[in-house]
């Protein structure tokens, strides 16, 4: 018995497709029926793909780049397809020559005249074709920079302008007396001001520890928290100034106030100073207002206080330099550890019967090989986050490129460095010691390390940072003369937070008198506890 098995029914059949062979080029020989009579638009693979449609938006909000999804291929008229009658595409060709505006004629041509070879005798634009260089004089350079700045402004390029807050809220009952813009203040000058004469010296200074000069990035040292009291007493509360005001001087201030006024043209942030003008007697009120500064300001003050005390030789067995009088801000029944500060009261004659008396400070003293003491002003620069501050990494460049680090700090903190320099010059310090202090972790603002130190002579450093003491004295004398013309009362000088302008206000006598009752409120969110009593920005002269 035999069976016949049909194997053809068990396997699927394979039909060979038709493959067209084009002998004259690439692609198919014939177009399929489904694609006949369809217009063809050339395209590019680099075209950006966007949304097919958006039914939720009625208009295009992206006005800056309205054609960002448009095709970049075939944009010419020869590739465009218009589904309309042929008669509408007919147009006449205008062969008339277009008259150019007169101001565009010869705009960038080589100017040759009586001035010589390619030289404009009137100081215009000289376009020499040597090596493709263009020479601009001063006026044209300023015009070019102005055009560039306007282009950026109208193009809305870059981040939005940062609006800074005012250091104090201007009240409705304050009368504006004068506005002094920075361009006018920069031109002021008061030359030939002699060095101040010492009237009184108070306090005790400790000697500098030279081992801190050997600190570098690889041999860093933690910044310690020094539990010492630094008295920040206002001018009106200073007992020495009250005593000296009976015999000498008619303008009284501190070195910090003078430095703020002298370096006002370099400031960007708002600040304010309270001025009290009285008759021939010093003011009698004993109130001192106090504010809570922001975290970075607190951190910088915290670092400066601890660094200036840590680099000194502390201890009962260590030698100390004592001035003629003790610290005037310590009472006899006070048993506290006071920071190393030396007070030097000096006077300057500014002309026109104006005698300035100011309290200046030294932070330390250094013993020279000859045995003579050298007084020091010790300050600290702090690094909080180089990426956010547009700075350089201190741990990478401090040992090899310290000049680049200092140049970056001069760019970011020009006003602060100038104020430190002016304070050192006014006090007569022999050295200005700068310390470089950085956070251990950029997110931890309570722990720091010392990465290095650097010292300068104050007058030489002032020349390096282009700080003119003649201009500083001129700005101070201008403000003193302006206040002297006013009647007796209380005034406030404030830097505008967003404009290079200083304003003088006539304020009521009871202004800021109630600030002491608000002291300590709103400080719960601060990242640092007050190491000592911080002075308010509203300093009193």
From Swiss-Prot:
Gene Ontology terms: biological process: cap-dependent translational initiation; formation of cytoplasmic translation initiation complex; regulation of translational initiation
Species of the source: Drosophila persimilis
Protein name (Swiss-Prot/TrEMBL): Eukaryotic translation initiation factor 3 subunit D-1
Basic residues composition-biased segments: 100-120
HAMAP family, per the entry: eIF3d
Keyword Cell inner membrane: no
Compartments where found: Cytoplasm
InterPro entries in the cross-refs: eIF3d (IPR007783)
Disordered: annotated segments: 98-136
Family: Belongs to the eIF-3 subunit D family.
Function summary: mRNA cap-binding component of the eukaryotic translation initiation factor 3 (eIF-3) complex, which is involved in protein synthesis of a specialized repertoire of mRNAs and, together with other initiation factors, stimulates binding of mRNA and methionyl-tRNAi to the 40S ribosome. The eIF-3 complex specifically targets and initiates translation of a subset of mRNAs involved in cell proliferation. In the eIF-3 complex, eif3d specifically recognizes and binds the 7-methylguanosine cap of a subset of mRNAs.
Keywords: Cytoplasm, Initiation factor, Protein biosynthesis, RNA-binding
GO CC terms, sorted: eukaryotic 43S preinitiation complex; eukaryotic 48S preinitiation complex; eukaryotic translation initiation factor 3 complex; nucleus
